[in-house]
């Protein structure tokens, strides 16, 4: 096998489906009513039900952490277990942690700034400040699991999850790590929801059961929240240790221009032809401008040949849900014979991305 072939061998998620090890399967999720803060009009979101991380990972302490940090720790533990990895037998200096997030630890950032506004910075809670840093979740993963390799956090708007996969692939293919824990996550908070409301980007179709990408009735997106962790390693390494393989990452490309989707997707085909792609994983979310832009890319590159799945219909919109969208597609493709899939990402403010995978 080529050293450029990279396998996903472990999956852990904290999502509206709950904390899960491995594939999501054919589970269903429901829109929930936002009750933690007052809202203007429609009050719907794909929310993670509250849970105690220590109930999922015994002994895990998260009381002083931002929710995102706690979720990333849980997702990492689940992914490592799913990959059948015992870190005691690994060189922890050769393990990388890569996190993609749109907003980072926004919940405790809000709390810290509110404390500073009310009492002045001199009286603001100093314990909160370290947990406001965007790279805090990745740092906690390294601390808790004793990982000493490259530790990178990136934020690329709506392409943060896709960017994390590509950064991890660069580290692995460049020989800087043997193994990567790839994380992506964001939480929904009052300030974020209020901003969405003020910007008039949320769907207000209260009667709709879910966002409706590509539908003439679409009128905006429904927000979501999640944290996802996957273990990536070379295909040779995965095979030698008998690890389960969910998908093989082939290649990926990004552009800062959201209108460059056609050229980016064609580059990501990497020698394959459009009919070879058996599944297009869209990032459409019910917003007319984004749906029209990505829809045009799909029609131009793939015509009407490739099946399209729009996971934000049941996951909601968040800047870092690219990896979770892939996991959802893996669940739907579980019984197919190793199809080629294209993960598309379109962000009107962040550009576009296309990543190709061979599903198991």
Regions found by a protein language model. Name each.
Residues 10-12, 98-100, 155, 180-186, ...:
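Short beta-strand segments
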Residues 57-77, 124-133, 151-166, 212-229, ...:
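Active-site pocket-shaping loop/turn-to-helix segments
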Residues 72-84, 134-137, 142-145, 151-184, ...:
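Active-site-proximal alpha-helical scaffold in enzymes
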Residues 19, 108-111, 165, 191-196, ...:
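Short acidic, glycine/serine/threonine-rich loops at helix termini
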Residues 3-16, 22-25, 29-40, 200-279, ...:
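Condensing-enzyme catalytic core mediating Claisen C-C bond formation in acyl metabolism
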Residues 176-199, 206-211, 218, 251-261, ...:
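Acyl-CoA/ACP chain-elongation machinery
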Residues 2-5, 91-95, 124, 147-150, ...:
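Short coil/turn connectors at secondary-structure junctions
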Residues 5-8, 25-140, 144-153, 186-188, ...:
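Conserved beta-ketoacyl condensing-enzyme motif
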């Amino acid at each position: 096998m080529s050293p450029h072939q990279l396998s996903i061998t472990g999956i852990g998620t904290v999502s509206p489906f709950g904390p899960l090890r491995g594939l999501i399967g054919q589970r269903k999720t429901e829109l929930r009513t936002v009750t933690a803060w007052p809202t203007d009009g429609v009050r719907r979101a794909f929310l993670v039900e509250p849970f105690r991380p220590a109930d999922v990972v015994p002994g895990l302490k998260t009381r002083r952490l931002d929710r995102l940090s706690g979720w990333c720790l849980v997702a990492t533990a689940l992914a490592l277990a799913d990959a059948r990895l015992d870190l005691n037998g690994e060189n922890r200096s050769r393990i990388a942690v890569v996190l993609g997030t749109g907003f980072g630890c926004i919940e405790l950032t809000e709390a810290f700034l509110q404390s500073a506004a009310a009492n002045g910075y001199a009286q603001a809670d100093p314990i909160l400040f370290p947990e406001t840093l965007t790279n805090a979740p990745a740092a906690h993963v390294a601390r808790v699991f004793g990982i000493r390799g490259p530790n990178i956090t990136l934020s690329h708007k709506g392409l943060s999850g896709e960017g994390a996969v590509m950064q991890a692939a660069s580290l692995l293919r460049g020989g800087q790590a043997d193994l990567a824990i790839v994380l992506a996550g964001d939480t929904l908070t009052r300030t974020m929801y209020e901003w969405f409301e003020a910007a008039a980007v949320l769907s207000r179709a209260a009667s709709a059961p879910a966002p409706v990408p590509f539908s003439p009735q679409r009128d905006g997106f429904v927000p979501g929240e999640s944290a996802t962790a996957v273990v990536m390693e070379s295909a040779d390494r995965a095979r030698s240790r008998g690890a389960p393989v969910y998908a093989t990452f082939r290649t990926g490309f990004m552009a800062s221009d959201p209108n460059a989707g056609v050229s980016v997707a064609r580059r990501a085909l990497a020698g394959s032809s459009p009919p070879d792609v058996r599944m297009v994983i869209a990032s459409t979310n019910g917003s007319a401008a984004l749906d029209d832009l990505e829809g045009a890319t799909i029609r131009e590159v793939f015509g009407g040949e490739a099946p399209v799945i729009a996971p934000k219909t049941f996951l909601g919109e968040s800047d870092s849900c690219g990896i979770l969208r892939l996991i959802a597609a893996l669940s739907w493709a579980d019984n197919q014979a190793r199809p080629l899939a294209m993960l598309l990402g379109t962000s009107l403010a962040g550009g576009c991305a296309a990543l190709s995978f061979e599903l198991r």
